[in-house]
Amino acid sequence: MLRLDLQFFASKKGVGSTKNGRDSEAKRLGAKRADGQFVSGGSILYRQRGTKIYPGENVGRGGDDTLYAKVDGTVKFERFGRNRKKVSVYPVA
């Protein structure tokens, strides 16, 4: 009786895995309302991390530093100091 001793070798080289190739979802930060735009109370004006823009008149700051309107009115982005910015909402008379 004839026995064949066949050995099969890999046709492709074994490839290791990489730890790269992932990224987090974009957080959609930035201005949500434009200068001069009319907004209602509770509207989100600016989403940010930290205080890139400070709250001005009739604007509140949420727990995640989001700026929102406290009253109905017109949005105004302003500078104060040498290099700081703030956003205010002025009620329409």
Swiss-Prot record:
InterPro entries: Ribosomal_bL27, Ribosomal_bL27_CS. One of its GO terms (cellular component) is cytosolic large ribosomal subunit. PROSITE patterns: RIBOSOMAL_L27. The N-terminus is cleaved by ribosomal processing cysteine protease Prp. One of its GO terms (molecular function) is structural constituent of ribosome. It comes from the Bacteria. GO terms for biological process: translation. Keywords: Ribonucleoprotein, Ribosomal protein. Residues 1-9 form a propeptide. Pfam families: Ribosomal_L27. HAMAP family: Ribosomal_bL27. PANTHER family: LARGE RIBOSOMAL SUBUNIT PROTEIN BL27M, RIBOSOMAL PROTEIN L27. Belongs to the bacterial ribosomal protein bL27 family. This is Large ribosomal subunit protein bL27. It comes from Bacillus licheniformis (strain ATCC 14580 / DSM 13 / JCM 2505 / CCUG 7422 / NBRC 12200 / NCIMB 9375 / NCTC 10341 / NRRL NRS-1264 / Gibson 46). The gene is rpmA.
